[in-house]
Amino acid sequence: MTTYDTRTATDTRGSEQPGHVGTASYDANAITVLDGLDAVRKRPGMYIGSTGERGLHHLVQELVDNSVDEALAGVADRIDVTVLADGGVRVVDNGRGIPVGMHPVEKRPAVEVVLTVLHAGGKFGGGGYGVSGGLHGVGLSVVNALSTRLSAEIWTDGHRWTQDYRDGAPTAPLARHEATSRTGTSLTFWADGDIFETTEYSFETLARRHQEMAFLNGGLTLTLTDERSSARATAAVDEADSDPTAKTVSYRYDGGITDFVVHLNARKGEPAHPSVITIAAEDTERLLSAEIALQWNGQYTDSVYSYANAIHTHEGGTHEEGFRTALTTVVNRYAREKRLLRDKDANLSGEDIREGLTAIISVNVGEPQFEGQTKTKLGNTEVRTLLQKIVHEHLADWFDRNPNEAVDIVRKAVQAATARVAARKARDLTRRKGLLETAALPGKLSDCQSNDPATSEIFIVEGDSAGGSAKAGRNPQYQAILPIRGKILNVEKARIDKVLQNQENQALISAFGTGVHEDFDIAKLRYHKIILMADADVDGQHISTLLLTFLFRFMRPLVEEGHVHLSRPPLYKIKWSREHVEYAYSDRERNTLLERGRRDGRRIRDDSIQRFKGLGEMNAEELRVTTMDPDHRVLGQVTLDDAAFADDLFSVLMGEDVEARRHFIQRNAQDVRFLDI
């Protein structure tokens, strides 16, 4: 049951939330300095990944992560984020407040040290926090360094305190104000437009991440408010009882990750068992806790998402490994004990068992070992041990206490295994390029001459006629063409044997060379740029969605690593004269070009304005100039910032729930991107 609670939170200092490991002392002595702030403004990408839209939103997340750390320590239960009318962002929590006492080494207020010195904070040296997220503890100082202004307001030690910063440096000493019993921190920053490509925040992006954080921190209320004009503030949050035109959304899930699983499974049809299985354990000596929630549904793909200290570890790690190992062991043992597998039958594979499984794995680790600066894979071996132990014990017990549901789960896995055996020959489609050239590759593939995947690209083109134009208009040195004919399978409604028997899917798998699912190997990818090129109408968008669903469900790393792109063919050809031709990619752009031309005194007949009904209406030269030539084409890279959101979206668009799809279309009807005019 999803609930939204906007009540004012009470002071929770001194309390400990179940499953959250914290330490008691958090003052100036708890702040440890590891390094000075250096060159952040010169090389921002080293600290936040990019200076584009993703990096901009990362600044907000860094402040939110620090507030969430207070919740993990059991001393905060509310975070309010506001996008201000002037483009600033304010993050307020009701935690203990950043320490304001004099730092023993730096000889200045601790808050100033935290905001101006890289690697300074309560996350190091065991001070202040048992567990924490953030970008390796550099968050607050990096946000300050990449902002033109930052204002800090703190309620701690019985008073309100303030300090302002410009370009990362304080403009005045820390000021003490009136006495108060309130505690917490408010940080407001204005991102530097000279550093970032854009300073325009997406309400939808922020709302999705806030909802995710609320799921991962049961009982924590996160509120997002947008004070910009309504034209710029669109809140397309994914909740049926949220107003998509509202400027304020609030998330609170007292069920935590159990509610997360219910939310994800809501679009996936009838669950295989009514209740969500929940597992929780804590090791206080090693500052380690774990929560797991799982439930099977009637779908054919799995949705397993793991988090460490509230950070999505999309590459998995030891927590996922421990979970998967124990899950496979328990289900196979139960299947043998209950004679659901015969003696001669092979064990069920992990892939068989996870078919239709939705699971959230959330661990809090005192000393997390992440692989890479971006924290995408957890490496702590003790986490694997803990997860294996608790999943084995709790899941085996649940199976014993719920025999009917357990049998249904095992039978579903047995059916998946049968389908896997039937699809074994299709799985042999993964071949390297040398083999592909002599094997039964789809004859329709027009390969490129280059053997270098890094410089090669493949266009997946809808229809034979468009494929012919694309083949004639391509640069054969590095551009390959694969026309898609016939019916493209909706993989959201099909088991893997049916998916791999589909002729078009076979062609895609052969051409890419990577294999699918557990056989997937991105090192075998033959083209580092995969471009979906469909008609610029609703039918074309539907075909692109079918292809994206296939890639997301069976070749997700292609999306995660940025190899998938959508072409943007023009909608209109405007022929002013034989020598002067322009192309418009939308109705708005067509109108703008026509108005500008008429202002310049040019005339045009109605029959000189052509609306392309499909790619096949363009000749090879037009297709080359507008859609294929890297110097002129418009491409959109498909990115995956939120896998759980994408999972839910594909379930809505391509799944069995007609009512959810109708609701989604109604909510987004105001967005012109969904209209075929």
Curated annotation (Swiss-Prot):
Induction: By novobiocin and repressed by sucrose. The keyword Ribosomal protein does not apply. It catalyses: ATP-dependent breakage, passage and rejoining of double-stranded DNA. Mg(2+) 2 binds at residues 535, 537. It is found in: Cytoplasm. There are two genes for gyrB in this organism. One which is novobiocin-sensitive (gyrBS) and one which is resistant (gyrBR). Few gyrases are as efficient as E.coli at forming negative supercoils. Not all organisms have 2 type II topoisomerases; in organisms with a single type II topoisomerase this enzyme also has to decatenate newly replicated chromosomes. This is DNA gyrase subunit B, novobiocin-resistant.
